């Protein structure tokens, strides 16, 4: 669905339906005077008498077909004092889905309404971004492998237009809507990659996706293979890919617009295990098919770069994606094996299903040596322990830099990504002691998410601003909503985009 703009006031507006957002106990006919001018039948539409504007309620009001706006799709927001950006996103998604069900080709939203529905701490521009993003996410479907199409399946609307009162579209409104469009595109990219089957979405496939983004947007892309990684000394990463038939890749993608080449980059490292059997420490069969989503960290970074390509922000950003399968094989790493990491530290691998931290530790060392980053953020579906602690809607945030941690948590909350701070207690590092090596890759069952984060902490140089995001819970969902039909969620794409666009606060 395209995002468009119509200026010139109600006399110039044309749409098959207009979505309006209504608070409980506020009359529908008073939502916007310009809309009432364009659709005067709205004040007497019978369906309007029954509409109570409860949260998630959607009503369709039909007018005479001769009018330029023959339908109004009213979406309830509930009580004004309870309104949040998340509720606005959900309302936009619910409204556009109803428009799709009605087979409406062109949909409008009155721009002047956006400021009046903004929660106290936000403005019309933020609401415009959320409405556009929510509407686009509401139309997301993953059905590319269905060969038999449903004849009743409605097509998406062709466009959503913001309807403006003045002669021109304000530049800031245009920018806000385009930002919402860009981040929704990025989340769609991440969702597609997580939802894709592991026989298609291989490390080589992720590399080809990165290269396609590079060609389209001018990003610099490098791809390193198995032999190069081994010769570089990435023994921990190699211990994971040793048993896999699909060849591993380390993907580097860089956004460096003119004038930013000398900046210290913001570096994101994303776990890219395209299928995780657990290796020799084999997982149970139940739900193993969901382990195709164990590359959600890498997918989020590719989604970020897809969004950056649409907005071209003046900031240097690097993505590092260590990608492999974790498979059992005659060559696979055995529990008890000892490997030497890129940092020179040795690790005793007690459990081959704790593989994410092994490829991440080498990637983190590589990133620090090569770029001396302004800040270093890794994200990974790392531990089931984090899901046990926080559930499926909240990610774990491990960071001993208060300013960086606050930036991630606050910006994430604004855009619908929830993070909760968890500790990096130094005493827990005792859990990672090995009798035969510098470190063990696992500790006791208790505090599993903290132990994993502390393992990564051993590979962060002094003075480096670092955060670890354990996104195992919210990266994939079985729960359907107006914003997501289930499966990959695109979690963290928007948070990363906000960190790039707003910058990292000083420590």
Swiss-Prot record:
The active site is at residues 283, 357. Its EC number is 3.4.11.1, 3.4.11.10. Presumably involved in the processing and regular turnover of intracellular proteins. Catalyzes the removal of unsubstituted N-terminal amino acids from various peptides. Keywords: Aminopeptidase, Cytoplasm, Hydrolase, Manganese, Metal-binding, Protease. GO terms for cellular component: cytoplasm. Belongs to the peptidase M17 family. Coiled coil: none annotated. Binds 2 manganese ions per subunit. Mn(2+) 2 binds at residues 271, 276, 294, 355. This is Probable cytosol aminopeptidase. SUPFAM superfamilies: Macro domain-like, Zn-dependent exopeptidases. It holds the Pfam family Peptidase_M17. It is found in: Cytoplasm. One of its GO terms (biological process) is proteolysis. Mn(2+) 1 binds at residues 276, 353, 355. The keyword Secreted does not apply. One of its GO terms (molecular function) is metalloaminopeptidase activity. It comes from the Bacteria. It catalyses: Release of an N-terminal amino acid, Xaa-|-Yaa-, in which Xaa is preferably Leu, but may be other amino acids including Pro although not Arg or Lys, and Yaa may be Pro. Amino acid amides and methyl esters are also readily hydrolyzed, but rates on arylamides are exceedingly low; Release of an N-terminal amino acid, preferentially leucine, but not glutamic or aspartic acids. Its main location: cytoplasm. Its cofactor is Mn(2+).
